[in-house]
Each structure stands twice: as C-alpha cells, then as structure tokens.
Amino acid sequence: ISKYKLFVSDTGLFVTMVFWDKDFAENIIYQKLLADKLEANLGYIYENLMAQMLTAAGNRLFYYTFEKDEKHSYEVDFLLSRGNKICPIEVKSSGYKSHTSLDAFRAKYSSRIKNSYLFYTKDFMVGDNEMIYIPFYMAGLI
C-alpha cells in the first residue's frame, strides 16, 4: 500500500477538532459553519461524513488513485464492492459538474463498474452519463 486515507469515526468531533482555535473558531468559523456560510473548501469534512455513513451502513471502503501524467494522479474517493462489480464514489462539497477523476476511472474500467455515484448537496438525479447524483443524507441507502 503506497497511499491511504484515515477518517475519524465521529464527524461532529472531527469538525470540532479541525476548527478548534478558541479565539477564532468559536466566534467566526464555527458560527459560519453552523449557518452554512463558510467559504472554505469543506471536501475533507464531507469525505469524512461519507466514510462514517457508508461504514455505518455495513460497507467496506476502498480508495483508489491512478496516474494521470508524470506529476499528477486521479483519485477516486471511495470504491464499494458489489458482487464481481465495483461502484466508484466521488464526494463533492461544491462544483459537482466537474468530476474528472471519476470520469477517467469510468472510462478506464467501464466493464467492471456496476453504478457510479456522486454525493453532493443537491437533489437526487440520474445524469445523462448514467452517473447517479445523490444527496449526502441518502448515503446509507446505496
């Protein structure tokens, strides 16, 4: 194993730990987070949330990267096993229309994929490309 990800089993505790700078967090960051007005990239929090929810639903989680070019690589946030097929998952805190890594993975391994999921903050839909877009709160249903 050359790369791995670690997740905290309690996302609420994780958020508190990430933003725990008493003078700043309690007064500004934490209030903005609670009001859903934080401008920061919250991808790592959403990924942790998904890891917690998918694991609670009984899924074994896998992570995958593959080379894009000499200096860059693609990253698939999660892979789920479904029989002899896999389900790649991308987690988006914003900008859900861009999913380059997931598209590259789907093109490379199309015969091995059952369903492709993108979790995001909007409503459920099935895209033109047969990608399934799912709101975060439905993670336990896949």
Name these PLM-found stretches.
Residues 121-142:
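Domain-level recognition of nuclease-like catalytic cores that cleave nucleotide substrates
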Residues 95-104:
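Active-site-adjacent loop/helix micro-motif of nuclease/hydrolase catalytic cores
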Residues 60, 114-115:
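Residues at the starts of beta-strands that form the adenosine-phosphate
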Residues 105-114:
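Arginine/glycine-rich "motif VI" loop of SF2 helicases in the C-terminal RecA-like domain
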Residues 16, 99, 125-129:
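Switch/connector loops and helix/strand junctions flanking conserved nucleotide-binding motifs
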Residues 85-96:
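Active-site ExK catalytic segment of metal-dependent nucleases
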Residues 1-75, 80-83:
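Accessory nucleic acid-recognition modules appended to NTPase machines
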Residues 7, 89, 117-119, 132:
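Hydrophobic/aromatic beta-strand patches that form the interior of the parallel beta-sheet core
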